[in-house]
A protein has these predicted regions:
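Bacterial Sec-dependent signal peptides at the C-terminal "C-region" and cleavage site
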Residues: 5-25
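Cell-envelope and extracellular/periplasmic
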Residues: 20-320
């Protein structure tokens, strides 16, 4: 496997998703998806128990039935979940490594035999796959309940480097080392790290120092990720901590402001896109997990729209 550090540059024609090919369609473009439980994915697909899943309100099957045109690309003519042949996902969860073509189920609860949730990766992958002429690999590196302040703490922030910052890069390295085995169709191709998508923030709300340092720590994270992969202009997308929509407490508003401010910090030199997600929150009454506000109440529409926006934000950067 050949590791390529150059960033591919694309032109996307106005009004369509056709992109100029990269230097070679043999190159696998790799996007790192990082964060905590909402990047793991909590959107319910099909579970509809009247007590535990609110009768299926807000699950993927329900929202697809209400708006079939918007979601029609997710299933084939026979009603089976589509599996893309040009976009791939690799995610290690507690059950082990999941690796395969983009479809539902690459989440913290998922396995090859159990696919009942989605995360942002689903529509991120569709956005990138539709825009890029060549194979795409999404490497998910997400763990629930982790803070940027401690767990993902990057080296340039000072102090002890976070365990999950180190594990994030270890997962990427392992994925690239094993790409020929885990994705035989990609065997022998060169790969390049083409973008970084960050969707996190919940745990940093509950520590005064974490709140105050979030903006700076996020800037350090972006700089250090770019340094790790020798790409000072690596495209980066920051997903807003948008749980609950516009109505939010002081601490959540502080994290949101820090995320937005970090995206425009001069030392990053641009090529960072902040994506607001508050508009994608849905009421608990219309969602499967009425007691899980920290997980967007498990609403599949929320996770679909978040992924759509994050993926679209990355495509915007790739146009430059």
């Amino acid at each position: 496997m050949i590791f390529v550090v150059a960033i591919a540059v694309f032109f996307i024609a106005t009004g369509c998703c056709t992109a100029l090919p990269p230097k070679s369609t043999d190159i696998v473009q790799v996007y790192i998806l990082a964060g905590q439980s909402n990047m793991e994915g909590q959107g319910v697909v099909d579970m509809d128990h009247p007590k535990y899943y609110n009768g299926g309100k807000g699950n993927l099957n329900t929202v697809m039935a209400a708006d079939p045109d918007h979601y029609k690309h997710l299933k084939d003519a026979k009603g089976n979940w589509r599996v893309r042949e040009d976009v791939f996902v690799r995610f290690r969860n507690k059950q082990g490594v999941m690796a395969g073509g983009l479809t539902i189920g690459f989440t913290g609860y998922g396995s090859d035999r159990s696919r009942h949730h989605i995360g942002p990766e689903l529509q991120i992958g569709h956005q990138l796959g539709d825009a890029i002429d060549g194979p795409v690999l999404l490497i998910k590196t997400a763990w629930g309940g982790k803070s940027l302040y401690k767990d993902f703490r990057p080296p340039s922030a000072g102090g002890q480097v976070g365990e999950y910052y180190t594990r994030m890069h270890a997962e990427v390295k392992q994925a690239l080392d094993n790409i020929d085995r885990e994705f035989p169709v990609l065997a022998g191709r060169s790969v390049e790290i083409s973008g970084f998508i960050w969707f996190q923030g919940w745990n940093d709300m509950f520590n005064k120092d974490a709140l105050e340092q979030y903006e700076d720590n996020l800037v350090h994270l972006i700089k250090d990720v770019r340094k790790e992969y020798k790409q000072p202009k690596l495209p980066v997308v920051i997903g807003e901590l948008g749980n609950g929509g516009l109505k939010a407490g002081k601490n959540m508003l502080s994290i949101r402001a820090a995320q937005k401010a970090a995206a425009t910090r001069k030392e990053l030199g641009g090529n960072v896109n902040f994506i607001s997600t508050t508009a994608f929150a849905r009421p608990k009454e219309h969602s499967p997990n009425v007691g899980h506000g920290h997980h967007w109440f498990g609403n599949a529409e929320s996770y679909f729209l978040i992924g759509d926006a994050l993926g679209g934000g990355m495509v915007e950067l790739l146009k430059k």
